[in-house]
Amino acid sequence: MISTVAGDGTVGYSGDGGPATQAQMREPNDCALDGKGGLLIADIQDQRIRRLDIETGIITTFAGTGEKVHTGDGGLASEAGIFGARAICVDGQGNTYICEREGNSIRMVDSSGIITLMSGGDEKGYSGDGGPAIEATLNGPKAIRCDAKGNVLVVDTENHAIRK
């Protein structure tokens, strides 16, 4: 049997603090379990990551303000601008990685809710192999996965590459 756990079938943004099945979403693209009883949902057109508490069915905003900008690094993820949240993954330490397609970047939200740029930035490019991830550039990343060894793998789509 199939049933809806989040979203009411209409386009928009609403419902924080209420039942997830009554919430609106614009374009959910990916989801990941957070290891704390939640399902994180990347909504690329809403510029947010939402969190569904699986036990209570309540939805809240985990990251993003709805503004289509790349802002807020070093601050709370809930107060940061997210630029095209295409995909997410959660590592074994509880850190959440956000793949920002339009922002050409990977950002991390640590267990205390602080967001940090990990790789890329607003400018498109293909550089940085062999160096620190923070100095690398990306071009339209579309997917991200965290492996059991703590690596973050990125589908760097427009560069026709998988990067780690």
Listing of model-derived features with the role each one plays in the protein:
Residues M1, Q47-R51, I58, N104-M108, ...:
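A short loop-to-beta-strand structural motif that recurs across blades of beta-propeller domains
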Residues L33-K36, V90-Q93, C146-K149:
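Residue-level detector of Asp-centered blade-edge/turn motifs that repeat once per structural unit
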